[in-house]
Regions:
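Enzymes that bind and transform nitrogen-containing heteroaromatic metabolites
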Residues: 1-295
Length: 295
């Protein structure tokens, strides 16, 4: 039987298939726990992330096809990972759940440019549950919305982007001195401020971590793209990965550079980042894998 995107199951609970046992000594500081009933109906069980004491914890949320494509090539897509996930409702719910838990959402400029109307809040991807997410954040003593950090070395951003103009959503653009000069010429909204942290053409991962720490952020969510994810992996700053595996094969050829899960970073022999599988969930034909990286 042929399976098409239109025939995929949507809105199903993220059924738990396997959970790793709790470590003998559970971390003292954690974020999350039992979910509100409206969220638990879609994600049975608890959602807990261990927090570092000495630095912000960073978790990543990414999507990949069966053959490892995380995003289509520039010009092929205007929705980021939407075409890869098949616009899965379950994937959008997982995105909302992690945003609801986070102090900060970090996105790379490339991811910003392909989603002009996107706003990095739980309510944007799950509007029917907006009040539930707001109440959940209030119960955890979190700000009404996570602060969004856009990483752009060049400062080449569209000031009319919906995510840069959403009421009540603070945005910081982490950039270089050259990028800051360009941004100073743009009509950015009052909720956007610029942090000059990079040098040359690069925003170092360590400097980005300092921006998160200065905000008082304990938990940051990286939503890519693959270049930013690779930078954070290379700096050994990614603590967990929530990976949606979409049940499609996209393919690659010489006509366009479709992005893998990690771009711009390669690890030498014996230097790759290994992770331990901590949970497996499914919704329809989608798999939701959670990995914890070793220290």
């Amino acid at each position: 039987m042929e399976v098409t995107m239109a025939g995929r199951s949507e809105g199903l609970p993220l059924e738990s298939l396997w959970e790793a046992p709790e470590p003998p000594t559970a971390p003292v500081d954690r974020r999350g726990g039992p979910l509100p009933p409206a969220l638990a109906a879609r994600y049975p069980g608890e959602l807990i992330v261990a927090l570092h004491e000495e630095r912000p914890t960073i978790v990543a949320n990414m999507v990949s096809s069966l053959d490892g494509v995380a995003a289509l090539a520039p010009g092929e897509s205007n929705t980021g990972g939407g075409e890869i996930s098949g616009f899965s409702e379950a994937d959008r719910f997982m995105m909302a759940l992690l945003r609801g838990l986070a102090d900060v959402v970090v996105v790379g400029a490339g991811a910003v440019r392909v989603g002009h109307r996107h706003v990095w809040t739980a309510a944007h991807v799950q509007p029917a549950l907006a009040d539930t997410f707001a109440a959940w954040r209030a119960e955890m003593w979190l700000a009404p919305q996570p602060t969004v950090i856009v990483v752009s070395a060049s400062g080449n951003l569209d000031p009319t982007h919906a995510g840069l103009n959403a009421p009540g959503v603070p945005v910081i653009v982490a950039t270089t001195p050259t990028g800051a000069e360009r941004l100073a010429q743009l009509p950015l909204g009052p909720n956007v401020r610029v942090a000059t942290v990079g040098t040359g053409k690069h925003v170092p991962a360590g400097a980005l971590l300092e921006v998160i720490h200065a905000l008082g952020g304990r938990l940051a969510l990286c939503e890519g793209g693959p270049h930013l994810f690779g930078e954070l992996l290379r700096a050994r700053l990614v603590d967990e990965l929530f990976l949606t595996v979409a049940p499609q094969v996209v393919g690659r050829d010489d006509t366009a550079h479709r992005l893998g899960l990690v771009e711009g970073t390669s690890f030498g022999e014996g230097q790759g980042r290994w992770a331990g599988l901590s949970s497996v969930r499914r919704a329809g034909d989608d798999l939701f894998l959670r990995y914890r990286f070793a220290e």
